[in-house]
């Protein structure tokens, strides 16, 4: 556990249409039922300021570096105003997306982008990384079918299968790079409840 906090920081990662937000909500409700102090938040967003930045990030076509800096600025506000205070009070913080999403969605568009994103994060908040990250592993073909069946509401939803594959393999690479922190939950053929039960086993 990181030394600046007393609580526990849990993040959910993966591409579009993989059930990540559903699992974040299910874990939040489970911990609430156990009378555990817990908050649920998301990125990009989580605070009034960061949510305004989110609107630009997910709807406007930005230059790659501008998009990365927008995401990092939103994260700094989110961490400073919400995540860190909650952790210091002993809460479990569940976050729907965090640093790995920035790596895969913004970092891949830049030269040496993976290292750049992690180094920027360390500069902004050197002691704050998740205690555990769940990568919800759903094959790109399955994920894009799910997205196509719902109302697509941002620029990432409407990108094609090549984009979905690129994002998917980025998350797989990161899960292999950080196996102690990032737990892969293979979810393509599982129900939401079955995925939830697998996640609970890691807590």
Swiss-Prot record:
Concerning HAMAP family, the annotation shows:
Thymidylate_kinase
The record's section on InterPro entries has: P-loop_NTPase, Thymidylate_kin-like_dom, Thymidylate_kin_CS, Thymidylate_kinase
- Which biological process, per GO, is one annotated for this protein? dUDP biosynthetic process
Sorted keywords for this record are: ATP-binding, Kinase, Nucleotide biosynthesis, Nucleotide-binding, Transferase
Does the keyword Methyltransferase feature in the UniProt annotation?
A: no
By what name is this protein known? Answer: Thymidylate kinase
- EC number(s) per UniProt? 2.7.4.9
Q: Which GO terms describe its cellular component?
A: cytosol
This protein's species is Rickettsia conorii (strain ATCC VR-613 / Malish 7)
